[in-house]
């Protein structure tokens, strides 16, 4: 029996890690322009840090506001924004649905993806799949990818500001994953 382990190409974590976004992308050989997908709250919180970090690293970038649902409509909207920008890298910043959308759009465009989670509520940041919903929020499909994200950048200072209920949700998700893994081994 073979065992297989897959993970992001690079995982970076620490207080203030958002300030290292450009440097971490450069270390992986990622290129700009960079399209960042995030919700309103996350944009308000992190846009100044993205601006400084990406400017210092020489990356042109644009921010695209997430609609709130990882749907085929939103994925196509992000892909269109990426094409219009001439994006060479897609960055998702936020919760699981934002990260799933960024991953799906990047895969559809054949681009690398960087995930910057702002909550610790699931294992979505490191995953090689997206959960797709209808525009109304009803589950539609799982979309699997050949590889995990190119970079996962976790700013623990940002994660610590998230609502406690989302951390508790992440603990539940981790526990469920443990039981799933045990079942597979048994």
Over which residues does each language-model region extend?
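Short secondary-structure boundary/capping segments
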Residues: 1-3, 26, 105, 141-144
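Alpha-helical scaffold segments in soluble metabolic enzymes
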Residues: 20-24, 49, 77, 104, ...
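A glycine/threonine-rich phosphate-anchoring loop and its flanking beta-alpha core
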Residues: 108-186
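ATP/NTP phosphate-donor binding region
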Residues: 1-89
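Short, conserved catalytic/metal-binding motifs centered on acidic residues
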Residues: 14, 96, 175
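Short glycine-/acidic-enriched loop or helix-start segments at secondary-structure transitions
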Residues: 46-48, 100-103, 125-126, 163
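A short, small-residue-rich loop immediately preceding and capping a beta-strand
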Residues: 82-105, 109-120
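Glycine-/small-residue-rich active-site loops that bind phosphorylated ligands and cofactors
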Residues: 42, 69-71, 97, 120, ...
């Amino acid at each position: 029996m073979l065992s297989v382990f897959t993970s992001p190409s690079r995982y970076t974590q620490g207080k203030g890690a958002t300030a290292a976004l450009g440097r971490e992308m450069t270390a992986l050989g990622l290129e700009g322009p960079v399209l960042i997908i995030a919700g309103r709250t996350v944009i308000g919180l992190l846009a100044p840090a993205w601006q400084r970090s990406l400017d210092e690293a020489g990356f042109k970038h644009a921010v695209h506001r997430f609609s709130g649902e990882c749907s085929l409509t939103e994925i196509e909207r992000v892909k269109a924004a990426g094409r219009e920008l001439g994006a060479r890298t897609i960055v998702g910043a936020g919760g699981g649905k934002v990260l799933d959308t960024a991953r799906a759009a990047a895969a559809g465009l054949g681009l690398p993806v960087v995930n910057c989670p702002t909550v610790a509520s699931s294992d979505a940041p490191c995953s090689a799949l997206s959960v797709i919903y209808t525009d109304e929020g009803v589950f539609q499909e799982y979309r699997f990818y050949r590889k995990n994200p190119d970079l996962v950048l976790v700013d623990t200072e940002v994660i610590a500001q998230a609502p406690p209920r989302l951390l508790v949700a992440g603990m539940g998700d981790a526990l469920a994953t443990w039981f799933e893994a045990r079942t597979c081994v048994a």
